[in-house]
Amino acid sequence: MAHVVGYDSLNEASNGYIGVEDLNAPLGALQMGACPTPFQSMLLGDGVPQEVAVWKLGPKGARRSGVHQIDPAGRRAWLPGQDCIWKQHGVWEIGSNGEARLLRPDYFAVLDGQAVDFNRRYLRPFVNRFAGAIRSVEPEALIFVESVPPKALPEWGGEDAGKIVSAAHWYDGIVLTLKTFMPWLGVDVSTLRLVVGPWAVRRSFARQIRQLQQEAFQKMGGAPTLIGEFGIPFDLKEKYAYRSGD
C-alpha cells in the first residue's frame, strides 16, 4: 500500500504496575481527583472500602487536598469463590485481626532478584518483534514508537530494528484536563507545574515539543519525531457544542 508509510507498535505503551517500587504509594506524578494507591485498588477490587487521597492541580503541581471514602458495598471484581489474583500471589493478605496487610510492596519492581526496567525488558523486545513481523510483509515500513506521557522512550541501539520513528503524543494539558481553553494558563507536563501568561505558555509549549524531539534523537539513535497525537477534547465547556450545535 503506497499510501501507508508505517505502523504504530502500541499506542501509549503503559508499564501498568511494572516497575512500581511501592504499591502503597501514589501511582505516578499525574494525580487528579480521588486516586487510590495500587494496593488500595486491589482492595477495592476485592470489595473492601477504602479512604483514598483526593488530589488537585495547583500552581506548584499536583497536591493532596483531602480524602474520599469509596465503598464498593461488597461488590468484587472476581468470580464468587475466587480470591484476588494478587492475594493468591502473596502480594497481600488478610491478617489475624481481619485487616488487609501489604506483604510485598515491591512485587512488580523486582524479578529474579533484579530491578525491573519496563522499557528494556518488555517494550524494546516487543517493538523489535513487532518490526520483524511487519517487515516480513512490508520490508520498507516505518515503525512508530511512543510511551505514556511523560515517561521516557526506550533506549535504542544499532542492534535494534532500524527505520524507527518516535510518535510521541502532545496535548495542551489544561485544555485536556479542565475542558476549557485559557490562553493565559498552561501546564508543563514534565513537572506538572502551572505556567501563567500567554507568552510564557507559548514558550512552554514550544519547549515541551522540542524536548520530545530531542529525547527521541538522543535515546533512539537519531530517530525523527512525528507527533502521533494532538488536539482538543470534543466536550469543551461542559459539552456546550453538543447542546448548541456550534
Can you say where each PLM-predicted feature lies in the sequence?
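Active-site region of glycoside hydrolase catalytic domains
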Residues: 1-240
